[in-house]
């Protein structure tokens, strides 16, 4: 490939990446209020169903292995999130909507990013199909054998595919 063509191609790719980062219109307002935990990565807040952005927690019925024994990792992720929230108000910043119409958002309780907390505890994986934001937290959890990383498991995406 000629140098000019390569530079043009790189410029086009860079511009496309930049365009993907620009907002596509009016941003949705924040969603704030008490949260009901639906599962390890889904909340109900102010009458809205919210999927946490950039994380993928085990499915509610998913089993993992820890210490050679089955572990209800999906149920534990849900309960741990419920315990963290403990009725405190959640503030969610919408990022997108998913194919089911749910708001996809970054949410926090008292300044604690829920996605970072879940991934750092090893209760969810960084969902790199959508964001690399939580990869450092996943690396930390892996390094320290936290949660999922203390045994063996199918990623939630693999588990969903296997259930079809």
Q: Model-found features: residue ranges?
A:
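Small beta-barrel nucleic-acid-binding modules, primarily SNase/OB-fold domains
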Residues: 1-164
């Amino acid at each position: 490939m000629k140098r000019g063509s390569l530079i043009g191609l790189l410029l086009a790719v860079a511009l496309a990446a930049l365009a993907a980062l620009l907002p596509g219109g009016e941003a949705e307002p924040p969603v704030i209020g008490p949260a009901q935990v639906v599962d390890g990565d889904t909340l109900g807040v102010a009458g809205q169903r919210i999927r946490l952005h950039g994380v993928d927690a085990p499915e509610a019925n998913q089993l993992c292995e820890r210490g050679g024994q089955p572990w209800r990792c999906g149920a534990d992720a849900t309960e741990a999130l419920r315990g963290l929230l403990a009725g405190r108000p959640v503030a969610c910043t919408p990022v997108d909507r998913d194919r089911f119409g749910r708001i996809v958002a970054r949410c926090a309780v008292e300044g604690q990013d829920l996605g970072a907390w879940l991934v750092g505890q090893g209760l969810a994986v960084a969902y790199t199909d959508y964001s690399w934001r939580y990869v450092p937290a996943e690396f930390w959890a892996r390094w320290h054998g936290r949660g999922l990383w203390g045994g063996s498991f199918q990623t939630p995406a693999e588990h969903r595919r296997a259930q079809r």
